[in-house]
Swiss-Prot record:
The presence of a 'disulfide through disulfide knot' structurally defines this protein as a knottin. This is a cyclic peptide. It comes from the Eukaryota. Transmembrane segments: none annotated. This is Cyclotide vibi-J. InterPro entries: Cyclotide, Cyclotide_bracelet_CS, Cyclotide_sf. Keywords: Disulfide bond, Knottin, Plant defense, Signal. Disulfide bonds join C76-C92, C80-C94, C85-C99. Residues 1-9 form the signal peptide. GO terms for biological process: defense response.
Length: 105
């Protein structure tokens, strides 16, 4: 079982993004004139792990509660440890390794 730990740790070296956030990004891009993602965004998106497990999404949300209380922000369903927020197209920015959208904006 000890040999499985490095592989498990490696899987957490990727950023995460929720299925819902990907859908929001695609809706926003679809409303643009050309409806295409740029090459940099496609590269970043393929470097992230899409999560759809509600337990993982809840863990991402709960890990950000202390920041939420201080900044008037809420998580965008994406981490930004290694790759910047793709959800910037929907108004999100990286703060403490999680992408947030200011609820006051």
């Amino acid at each position: 079982a000890a040999f499985a730990l490095p592989a498990l740790a490696t899987s957490f070296e990727k950023d995460f993004i929720t299925h819902e956030t990907v859908q929001e990004i695609l809706k926003k891009v679809g409303s643009n004139s050309n409806g295409m993602l740029d090459e940099q965004t496609i590269s970043a998106l393929t470097g992230k792990t899409i999560i759809s497990n509600p337990l993982l999404e809840e863990a991402l949300f709960k890990s950000s509660n202390s920041i939420n209380a201080l900044g008037g922000t809420f998580p965008c369903g994406e981490s930004c440890v290694w790759i910047p927020c793709i959800s910037k197209v929907i108004g999100c920015a990286c703060k403490s390794k999680v992408c947030y959208k200011n609820s006051l904006a």
